């Protein structure tokens, strides 16, 4: 990827999903899962190589050159509303999350008949608070205490600080 001079790299740890070809290959012994220590060493090497090659490590699994961050993912991590179109697409309006059917035929049928085909999950203040903290801590921008206070109140901001202080060097 470095020699191809790509502007953005997403590098996720490989997982084995039950029911997939890769899962079956592992079960048959055709591929071997890495030990956790080896996986950690490979990730640290990736961070070093990409950093040396001019990539900014801006989120746990994402690297970019020249500030070319993934727009959709950055919006997600910062809690910005977004619209997902198509089968299996996700949307967020600031208050709820919607997931379109994963089956293309089911999605198309719903569109043609004018029916609402998505599943909706209403967010609670607690879920929004927890998600903001967890997604913020994944990024190089970290947690914005002013935003935390503005969006969730001074008590929740103080609680977050109280919980974090023992872990700050």
Walk through the language-model features, giving the residues of each:
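C-terminal scaffold of the Radical SAM
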Residues: 1-154
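Short amphipathic alpha-helical interaction segments
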Residues: 153-168
């Amino acid at each position: 990827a470095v020699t191809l001079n790509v502007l953005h790299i997403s590098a996720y740890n490989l997982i084995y999903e039950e029911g997939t070809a890769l899962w079956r290959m592992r079960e048959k012994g055709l591929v071997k899962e890495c030990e956790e220590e080896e996986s950690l060493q490979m990730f640290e090497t990736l961070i070093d190589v990409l950093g040396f090659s001019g990539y900014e490590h801006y989120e746990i699994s994402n690297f970019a050159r020249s500030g070319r961050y993934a727009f959709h993912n950055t919006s997600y991590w910062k809690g910005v509303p977004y619209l997902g179109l198509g089968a299996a697409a996700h949307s967020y309006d600031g208050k709820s999350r919607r997931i379109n059917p994963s089956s293309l035929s089911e999605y198309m049928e719903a569109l043609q008949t004018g029916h609402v085909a998505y599943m909706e999950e209403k967010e609670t203040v607690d879920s929004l608070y927890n998600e903001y903290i967890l997604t913020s801590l994944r990024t190089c921008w970290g947690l914005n205490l002013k935003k935390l206070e503005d969006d969730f109140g001074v008590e929740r901001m103080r609680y977050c600080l109280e919980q974090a202080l023992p872990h700050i060097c």
